[in-house]
Amino acid sequence: MNCPLLTIKAAAKLITEGGVLAYPTEAVYGLGCDPLNKDAFQQLLRLKQRPLEKGVILIASSIAQIEPFVKLHNQAWTEKVLASWQVLNQPVTWVLPATDNVPEWITGGRNTVAVRVTQHPDVMALCNQLNFPIVSTSANLSGEDPVTTMEACCKAFPALAIMQGNLMGISAPSQIWEAQTQKRLR
């Protein structure tokens, strides 16, 4: 395996310097970058061969980290969203109304953004080190199956560094729910 393996501290440095990182999540490997760095984001889309219109997920270590990006409070669904992020080993991503702070490249041109508060200890530590959420999209070429091993991740993206760590053993990527309609999207 030729991909460099990074500590959490080195991974945070890479992201702050505008890099794209592969990292373990709850169920699959993800690709991430600073959501406010357009150049890094465009590099991520090129690597993944993903169209801009699809949008991506922001993954954070805490509700406080996503608050600048979403209209979360005082909504009919607020309590359900907040409670879902407290359930262990059941990662849930919510599509929520975006604030004006969210760049169009993150939303895919919509007025919503997908967000998740992670329970993965290494991703939490990374977001805490950065003090902001990161982009999270599965580490695979668009349309292919997500990768579930470090080796497969390195084979798919040989030029990327991978943050050390393990998947949490959850069998499927996070559920995605639309908060305003309460419909499950995935």
Curated annotation (Swiss-Prot):
Its function, per the record, reads:
Required for the formation of a threonylcarbamoyl group on adenosine at position 37 (t(6)A37) in tRNAs that read codons beginning with adenine. Catalyzes the conversion of L-threonine, HCO(3)(-)/CO(2) and ATP to give threonylcarbamoyl-AMP (TC-AMP) as the acyladenylate intermediate, with the release of diphosphate.
The Gene Ontology terms for molecular function here are: ATP binding; double-stranded RNA binding; L-threonylcarbamoyladenylate synthase; tRNA binding
Keywords recorded for this protein, A-Z? ATP-binding, Cytoplasm, Nucleotide-binding, Nucleotidyltransferase, Transferase, tRNA processing
Q: Please give the family membership noted in the entry.
A: Belongs to the SUA5 family. TsaC subfamily.
Write out the catalysed reaction.
L-threonine + hydrogencarbonate + ATP = L-threonylcarbamoyladenylate + diphosphate + H2O
Boundaries of every YrdC-like domain copy: 5-186
- Please report a single Pfam family linked to this protein: Sua5_yciO_yrdC
Q: Which cysteines are joined by disulfide bonds?
A: none
EC annotation? 2.7.7.87
Question: Which compartments does it reside in?
Answer: Cytoplasm
| Name of the featured protein | Threonylcarbamoyl-AMP synthase
Q: Which Gene3D superfamilies match?
A: DHBP synthase
Q: Where mainly located?
A: cytoplasm
